[in-house]
Regions:
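Short inter-helical turns and helix N-cap capping residues of alpha-solenoid HEAT/ARM repeat scaffolds
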Residues: 7-8, 38-40, 69-70, 104-105, ...
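Structural detector for internal amphipathic alpha-helices that build alpha-solenoid repeat scaffolds
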Residues: 2, 10-24, 32, 41-56, ...
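Buried hydrophobic core positions in alpha-solenoid tandem helical repeats
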Residues: 1, 29-31, 61-63, 96-98, ...
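TPR/TPR-like (Sel1-like) alpha-helical repeat modules
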Residues: 158-168
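Structural signature of tandem alpha-helical TPR/SEL1-like repeats
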Residues: 88-94, 123-124
């Protein structure tokens, strides 16, 4: 209740922490808050942290949430699946993140690209990510360039160079150029 009615960051953080320690039983409440149109970005961040903490105890619930009708719930679920992939090597979670690359919501696709950049090996995912350099959403394209850079995917320099030449968004183009520069170091 305090999570919905109080704006004090300390109270919100304490509430999210308490809900995380409750465990899987709190997931429905946390996901329900995400569906509330008055949910603030700060609350979303706290919910994402709580879900990450809970996720290892309720992996199926997160997988189910990744199929929600509500984009904000799918984003949070995809974000929280990262811990399962990194610590548990959960192949179902990884498959769900790969599926999220084709989600109708650009926010979900952007989160999936970011998570792949944090949790996978470059040689396993670089072809998937190269395709996202042509995504219809600029944030997805930016996140893709950053993910390739984070993965140190030197084998994608040619694809990034091609993307930089055809990119119409100057902000995306700048990120792609930084990725090319970083990946070119030591080649």
């Amino acid at each position: 209740e305090a999570f919905l009615e109080d704006s004090d960051p300390v109270v919100l953080g304490s509430s999210a922490g308490a809900m995380a320690t409750i465990g899987p039983e709190a997931m429905d409440s946390l996901l329900g808050i995400l569906k509330n149109p008055d949910c603030t970005p700060f609350q979303v961040g706290l919910i994402n942290l709580a879900l990450s903490f809970i996720g290892s105890k309720a992996p199926q619930a997160l997988l189910d949430a990744a199929d929600s009708d509500v984009a904000e719930v799918r984003v949070a679920a995809i974000s929280a699946l990262g811990d399962q992939i990194q610590t548990l090597g959960d192949s179902d979670a990884q498959k769900k993140v790969f599926e999220a690359l084709e989600d109708p919501s650009p926010d979900v696709r952007a989160e999936a690209v970011t998570l792949i950049g944090k949790s996978c090996d470059a040689e396993d995912v670089q072809e998937l990510l190269i395709k996202k350099l042509a995504d219809s959403d600029s944030q997805v394209r930016k996140n893709t360039a950053m993910a390739l850079m984070k993965l140190e995917a030197k084998g994608t320099i040619n694809a990034l160079t091609t993307a930089a030449k055809t990119e119409s968004d100057k902000d995306v183009q700048a990120v792609i150029k930084v990725a090319i520069k970083i990946l070119s170091l030591g080649v």
